[in-house]
């Protein structure tokens, strides 16, 4: 039997597809890759938060719903909160390191005033403005290779990227991890999602990492409570340790940042809900929302 896999054609997306392909081929399945060009790929210079929620996801899922592919593979951070009817989250392989990193010759404290920092993320831009308001935040788009080329061509003094993407691509570049309190990662950063018909649930059982799935569901629940998609200035991270979910959520308008934390043995849905409600309360208390 052949399984057709829909995904974007970027180098990072292909690395993620490779993980799923290797798993399926080891189980004796043939695989076929269906490349999908999304609206976000076509509007390469626009900031991501201006294009809209679920922008990398919609067309890829449509290929499955229309029968052109059997499953879709996504960076889970690019997915909107709800999947369309007929599709389910089938598996989340083990999560890669979820932190943000500063690619630069100098760490964040050492960078001189007015250093130009490139990011295409409103969340990263706002968090950076709180920590180092004296730096110049500039929009950057393109895949990881393009961003690194622009950095190496001295268009920027530093760029902020996800550690997970650099690791999956095997990129060796000087970089500094950013602490999760000041730069709480994007919800589901470092997680790959396999999406498709519920009939495939059994097939992907062994690929699924239950700890990663719990973290993913808790983070999604927080996003649902707070509102805002993958391009809002919201950071959420859960880590599962000894059956305890440890969560942190942060929101910033570029002037103030609020951060809340919790640890609980409750289900991912309850944990995410509680963290989301705590963040909304903190945002109201600080006057970030009415």
Swiss-Prot record:
<protein>
    <recommendedName>
        <fullName>Probable porphobilinogen deaminase</fullName>
        <ecNumber>2.5.1.61</ecNumber>
    </recommendedName>
</protein>
<dbReference type="InterPro" id="IPR000860">
    <property type="entry name" value="HemC"/>
</dbReference>
<dbReference type="GO" id="GO:0005737">
    <property type="term" value="C:cytoplasm"/>
</dbReference>
<dbReference type="InterPro" id="IPR022419">
    <property type="entry name" value="Porphobilin_deaminase_cofac_BS"/>
</dbReference>
<keyword id="KW-0808">Transferase</keyword>
<dbReference type="Pfam" id="PF01379">
    <property type="entry name" value="Porphobil_deam"/>
</dbReference>
<dbReference type="GO" id="GO:0006782">
    <property type="term" value="P:protoporphyrinogen IX biosynthetic process"/>
</dbReference>
<keyword id="KW-0627">Porphyrin biosynthesis</keyword>
<comment type="similarity">
    <text>Belongs to the HMBS family.</text>
</comment>
<feature type="modified residue" description="S-(dipyrrolylmethanemethyl)cysteine">
    <location>
        <position position="230"/>
    </location>
</feature>
<dbReference type="InterPro" id="IPR036803">
    <property type="entry name" value="Porphobilinogen_deaminase_C_sf"/>
</dbReference>
<dbReference type="InterPro" id="IPR022417">
    <property type="entry name" value="Porphobilin_deaminase_N"/>
</dbReference>
<comment type="pathway">
    <text>Porphyrin-containing compound metabolism; protoporphyrin-IX biosynthesis; coproporphyrinogen-III from 5-aminolevulinate: step 2/4.</text>
</comment>
<dbReference type="GO" id="GO:0004418">
    <property type="term" value="F:hydroxymethylbilane synthase activity"/>
</dbReference>
<comment type="function">
    <text>Tetrapolymerization of the monopyrrole PBG into the hydroxymethylbilane pre-uroporphyrinogen in several discrete steps.</text>
</comment>
């Amino acid at each position: 039997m052949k399984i057709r896999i829909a995904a974007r054609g970027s180098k990072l997306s292909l690395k993620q597809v490779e993980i799923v392909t290797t798993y399926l081929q080891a189980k004796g399945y043939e695989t076929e890759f269906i490349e999908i060009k999304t609206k976000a790929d076509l509007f390469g210079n626009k900031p991501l938060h201006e294009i809209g929620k679920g922008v990398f996801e919609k067309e890829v899922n449509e290929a499955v719903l229309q029968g052109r592919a059997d499953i879709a593979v996504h960076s889970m951070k690019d997915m909107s909160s709800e999947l369309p009817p007929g599709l389910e989250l089938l598996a989340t392989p083990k999560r890669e390191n979820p932190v943000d990193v500063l690619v630069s010759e100098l760490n964040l404290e050492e960078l001189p005033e007015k250093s130009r920092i490139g990011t295409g993320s409103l969340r990263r831009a706002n968090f950076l403005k709180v920590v180092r308001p004296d730096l110049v935040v500039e929009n950057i788009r393109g895949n990881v290779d393009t961003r690194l080329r622009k950095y190496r061509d001295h268009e920027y003094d530093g760029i902020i990227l996800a550690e997970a993407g650099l690791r999956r691509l095997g990129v060796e570049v000087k970089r500094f991890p950013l602490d999760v309190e000041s730069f709480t990662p994007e919800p589901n950063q470092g997680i790959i999602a396999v999406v498709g018909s519920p009939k495939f649930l059994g097939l992907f059982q062994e690929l699924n990492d239950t700890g990663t799935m719990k973290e993913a569901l808790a983070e999604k629940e927080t996003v649902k409570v707070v509102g805002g998609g993958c391009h809002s200035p919201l950071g959420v991270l859960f880590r599962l340790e000894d059956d305890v979910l440890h969560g942190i959520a942060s929101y910033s308008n570029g002037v103030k940042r609020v951060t809340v934390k919790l640890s609980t043995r409750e289900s991912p849905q309850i944990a995410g809900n509680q963290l989301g409600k705590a963040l909304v309360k903190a945002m109201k208390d600080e006057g970030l929302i009415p």
